């Protein structure tokens, strides 16, 4: 349905995003704004309209950026178009956040009036400031008994440096203060700029796969206009497409004739998969292209890798189809086939971070009903060889011969941790144990902010879980990748009955190898059932064994049938048994149960 012919004047448009830490009420506030402006009827309102995936609703996080166009009649009698960009709050999706922010001129900073400023609030606000946003602070959840408005205002001023004296107070749950939020958007945020007669210049904010339409592309128009039938070109990938239809979300998809400068909408153009529509790309007219692309485009590079294998080898084809489907909708997820002697065929997958990895795993098991084993997550190492070559290592099992290696460099991150000061000692000890280097420590009221440099390898295992348990769930954590630094890293192999198990090999720092190896061996000993022969379980670095546990043999009483009689007869039978065991150990195969793999890979260090 075509709803309008003329483009909205620029001074009547406001493009804004909502920035907040997880659980500070961002999605609930979006729901209230949609409801108040009449975007959906009361019957169509479902809680968290913009979080489409079940996982998004259950975990209370926003994964994909969403957008909605609201029509608002302001106090001055004018009607404004408000484009709300709902951004993911989690650090793994920082690039999606940066593109959503680049499509807006202002941000609403939502802070929970009972919790105060958290680590991700900080990370996202800094991104908004980098994009020259006008920022309106909003204190949410003021209806809670624990809300302390003055303390949180002081915190916003101390930590972020924003003037919070005229912060809007509201409660998205009860609807108090929502009209004030809408007025603040209209009066305090700037309108977009743009030239309708210039060549088309649009930012590709996001893209997702729709079973009927193919890839749906979300765009923000800066100059020119976009309409059906137009031939457009993606400036980074060079691909050209003919536009099938153009529309806006109100939040229902509504077709329009064209999109003008300052507007946010979507188009479809029979694009086959999301990887062909790179987030952050500039879209222009093929016949009359714009001179230069918009700044800030980055190739999305996976940071964490792990192997995914089906528990039942017969499910491999289903897994192949499932990862292919997820890739359609998530260009930052990469995969390639991998085979392991212990686990059979599977895929080596790349993710943006740990939350991304968890979500993909959960979606595979939930939406595609697959039982999976995930190998230990590893990061990308850069290896300098003696012959001067540099290679990237995604899988520890593929490490070249030690004699060829000059040095191994690992990625380091800058981690910002907010914690109540009661738990500060435990948090600092955790960071020190993980080879962290303290950068700064400051106090904001009764909360401490610690900044550490940490190797990503030490964080991907279970850092986040440990941080939460040390701080009783109160600490919040955020990180950015810094650089690669050379380290004393060694490859640790686990041998069962003198055979290396490829799925359990990992790169560890030499200082941590022994404790990690001992823990792995103890775990495996508990879980490998007894066989008829002795099974040694060893952790080795190169040819040196650093830890060993032994699974004792089952023993059959071969002398039971000798009643009394000669001792040499018993001796002969025992010797014969010993010989048989020796031969058995040489040729016997050790069956390692799947539970042993899963438990060893989930090993929690103490």
Curated annotation (Swiss-Prot):
Pfam family, one: GTP_EFTU
UniProt superkingdom: Bacteria
Any one of the GO CC terms: plasma membrane
Residues binding GTP, per UniProt: 23-28, 140-143
Bilayer disposition of the protein: Peripheral membrane protein
EC numbers on record: 3.6.5.n1
Gene Ontology terms describing biological process: positive regulation of translation
Coiled coil, from the record: none
Domain tr-type G positions: 11-193
CDD domains referenced in this protein's UniProt entry, alphabetically: EF4_II, EF4_III, LepA, lepA_C
Subcellular location: Cell inner membrane
Keywords: Cell inner membrane, Cell membrane, GTP-binding, Hydrolase, Membrane, Nucleotide-binding, Protein biosynthesis
PANTHER family in UniProt: TRANSLATION FACTOR GUF1 HOMOLOG, CHLOROPLASTIC, TRANSLATION FACTOR GUF1-RELATED
Job description of the protein: Required for accurate and efficient protein synthesis under certain stress conditions. May act as a fidelity factor of the translation reaction, by catalyzing a one-codon backward translocation of tRNAs on improperly translocated ribosomes. Back-translocation proceeds from a post-translocation (POST) complex to a pre-translocation (PRE) complex, thus giving elongation factor G a second chance to translocate the tRNAs correctly. Binds to ribosomes in a GTP-dependent manner.
Name of this chain's protein: Elongation factor 4
Source organism of this protein record: Caulobacter vibrioides (strain ATCC 19089 / CIP 103742 / CB 15) (Caulobacter crescentus)
Lineage: Bacteria, Pseudomonadati, Pseudomonadota, Alphaproteobacteria, Caulobacterales
């Amino acid at each position: 349905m075509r709803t309008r012919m003329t483009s909205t004047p620029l001074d009547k448009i406001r493009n804004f995003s909502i920035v907040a830490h997880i659980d500070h009420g961002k999605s609930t506030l979006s729901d209230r704004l949609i409801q108040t402006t009449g975007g959906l009827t009361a019957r169509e309102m479902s809680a968290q309209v913009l979080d489409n995936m079940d996982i998004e609703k259950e975990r209370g996080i926003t994964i994909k950026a969403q957008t909605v166009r609201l029509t608002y009649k302001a106090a001055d009698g004018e009607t404004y178009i408000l484009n709300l960009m709902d951004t993911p709050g989690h650090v793994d999706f920082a690039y999606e956040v940066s593109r959503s922010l680049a499509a807006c001129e202002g941000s609403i900073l939502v802070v929970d009036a009972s919790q105060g400023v958290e680590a991700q609030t900080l990370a996202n606000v800094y991104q908004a400031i980098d994009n020259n946003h006008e920022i309106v602070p909003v204190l949410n959840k003021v209806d809670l008994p624990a809300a302390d408005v003055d303390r949180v205002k002081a915190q916003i001023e101390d930590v972020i440096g924003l003037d919070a004296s005229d912060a809007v107070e509201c409660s998205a749950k009860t609807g108090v203060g929502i009209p004030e939020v809408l007025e603040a958007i209209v009066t305090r945020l700037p309108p977009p700029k743009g030239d309708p007669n210039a060549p088309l210049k649009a930012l590709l904010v996001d893209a997702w796969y729709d079973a009927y339409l193919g890839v749906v592309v979300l765009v923000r128009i800066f100059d020119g206009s976009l309409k059906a039938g137009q031939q457009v070109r993606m400036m980074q990938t060079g691909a050209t497409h003919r536009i099938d239809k153009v529309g806006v979300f109100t939040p229902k998809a509504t077709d329009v004739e064209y999109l003008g400068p300052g507007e946010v909408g979507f188009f479809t153009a029979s694009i086959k998969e999301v990887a062909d529509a790179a987030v952050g790309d500039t879209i222009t007219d093929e016949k009359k292209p714009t001179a230069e692309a918009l700044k800030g485009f980055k190739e999305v590079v996976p940071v964490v890798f792990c192997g995914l294998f089906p528990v039942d080898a017969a499910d491999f084809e289903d897994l192949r189809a499932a990862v292919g489907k997820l890739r359609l909708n998530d260009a930052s997820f990469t995969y390639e086939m991998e085979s392991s002697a212990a686990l059979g065929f599977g895929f080596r997958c790349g993710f943006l971070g740990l939350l991304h990895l968890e979500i993909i795993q959960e979606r595979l098991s939930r939406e595609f009903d697959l039982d999976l084993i995930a190998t230990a997550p590893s990061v990308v190492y850069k290896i300098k060889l003696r012959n001067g070559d540099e290679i990237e290592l995604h899988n520890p099992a593929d490490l070249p011969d030690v004699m060829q290696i000059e040095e191994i460099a690992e990625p380091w991150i800058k981690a910002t941790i907010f914690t109540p000061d009661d738990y500060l000692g435990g948090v600092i000890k955790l960071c020190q144990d993980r080879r962290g280097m303290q950068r700064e420590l400051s106090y904001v009221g009764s909360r401490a902010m610690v900044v550490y440099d940490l190797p990503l390898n030490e964080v991907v295992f279970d850092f986040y879980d440990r941080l939460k348990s040390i701080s009783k769930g109160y600490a919040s954590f955020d990180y950015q990748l810094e650089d690669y630094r050379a380290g004393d890293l060694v490859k640790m192999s686990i041998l069962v009955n003198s055979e290396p198990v490829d799925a359990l090999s990992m790169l560890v720092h030499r200082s941590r190898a022994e404790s990690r190896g001992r823990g792995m061996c103890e775990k495996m000993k508990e879980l490998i059932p007894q066989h008829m022969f002795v099974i040694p379980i060893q952790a080795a670095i190169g040819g040196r064994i650093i830890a060993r546990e032994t699974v004792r043999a089952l023993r059959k009483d071969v002398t039971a049938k000798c009643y009394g009689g000669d001792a040499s007869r018993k001796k002969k039978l025992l010797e014969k048994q010993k010989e048989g065991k020796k031969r058995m150990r040489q040729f016997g195969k050790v069956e390692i149960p799947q539970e042993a793999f899963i438990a060893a890979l989930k090993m929690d260090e103490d």
